[in-house]
Amino acid sequence: MKPTTISHLRQWKQEQRKFATITAYDASFSRLFFEQGIRVMLVGDSLGMTVQGHDSTLPVTTHDIVYHTQCVRRGAPLALVLSDMPFMTYATPEQTFSQAAELMRAGANMVKLEGGSWLAPTVKMLTERAVPVCGHLGLTPQSVNIFGGYKIQGRSESDANQLLADALALEEAGAQLLVLECVPVALAKRVTEALSIPVIGIGAGNVTDGQILVMHDALGITGDSTPKFAKNFLAQSGDIRTAVRLYSQEVEQGIYPAEEHSFH
């Protein structure tokens, strides 16, 4: 089997073949995910909440992401691994490249940054230096204090138009992938159709090219804080491997996310 690359994701978009992705933080789970057919994994700064017990992603450091990226890479050497750049690690060009290089050396295939068109010069700079970039728009958790909480984004016409403009700007700057979080289905459809790069949704309906879930949400182990867009696949199956396979299959077949997991 050959390694999964961004070329595969582009081909899947062209073929209208939906794909599932998931967050991973260690070797055991990344190996299990890959064995059950998930080829793309994100070492997310969500680990600040799910693994470290913080109330946000803000305390996560590059050192944390490097460590978990190394673990995930060992468990799934053929997966396409995305790694988050934590809060305040891409404030200047010099800092950005240094931090991104650390993640790439740790085993990431691509780095993910949160932000709109203001990030375009940063995306261009990284792309020119052979660092593939995934953008992240909509509800960007590192901006939770600006948003005033975890709220749906892009509901007004002006906000929706701005988000679409941001997505196009990131693509033009060289982003090869986009995560779209907690936006209305209609807006997610506009963005997915407007971009030539694959769009991965979370809380964006089933109209995007791919889906991503935090593994703890997909397995129902986040307690009372499970978001509306999540589904507990372990409750359906009673077995972790079966749950992961079910998640992947429901995404590929367009069953998940359903209307009950979507926003308008």
From Swiss-Prot:
Recorded hits in Pfam families, A to Z, give:
Pantoate_transf (PF02548)
Question: In the UniProt entry, which residues are flagged as the active site?
Answer: E181 (proton acceptor)
Gene Ontology CC: cytoplasm
What EC number is given for this enzyme?
A: 2.1.2.11
- What compartments host this protein? Cytoplasm
Q: Which InterPro entries match?
A: Pantoate_hydroxy_MeTrfase, Pyrv/PenolPyrv_kinase-like_dom, Pyrv_kinase-like_dom_sf
Where is 3-methyl-2-oxobutanoate annotated to bind? Answer: D45, S46, D84, K112
Q: Pathway, according to UniProt? A: Cofactor biosynthesis; (R)-pantothenate biosynthesis; (R)-pantoate from 3-methyl-2-oxobutanoate: step 1/2
User: What UniProt keywords are attached to this protein's entry?
Assistant: Cytoplasm, Magnesium, Metal-binding, Pantothenate biosynthesis, Transferase
UniProt keyword Acetylation present: no
Q: What GO molecular function annotations does the UniProt record carry, in alphabetical order? A: 3-methyl-2-oxobutanoate hydroxymethyltransferase activity; magnesium ion binding
Q: Does the keyword Transcription regulation apply?
A: no
Give the note describing cofactor binding and stoichiometry. Answer: Binds 1 Mg(2+) ion per subunit.
Q: Where does Mg(2+) bind?
A: D45, D84, E114
Tell me the Gene Ontology biological-process terms attached to this UniProt entry.
Answer: pantothenate biosynthetic process
Q: What is its main location?
A: cytoplasm
Its required cofactor(s), as named, are: Mg(2+)
**Which reaction equation describes what this protein catalyses?**
3-methyl-2-oxobutanoate + (6R)-5,10-methylene-5,6,7,8-tetrahydrofolate + H2O = 2-dehydropantoate + (6S)-5,6,7,8-tetrahydrofolate
Q: How does it assemble?
A: Homodecamer; pentamer of dimers.
State the family it belongs to: Belongs to the PanB family.
| Function recorded in the entry | Catalyzes the reversible reaction in which hydroxymethyl group from 5,10-methylenetetrahydrofolate is transferred onto alpha-ketoisovalerate to form ketopantoate.
> What is the name listed in the Swiss-Prot or TrEMBL entry for this protein?
3-methyl-2-oxobutanoate hydroxymethyltransferase
Q: Identify the species of origin.
A: Pectobacterium atrosepticum (strain SCRI 1043 / ATCC BAA-672)
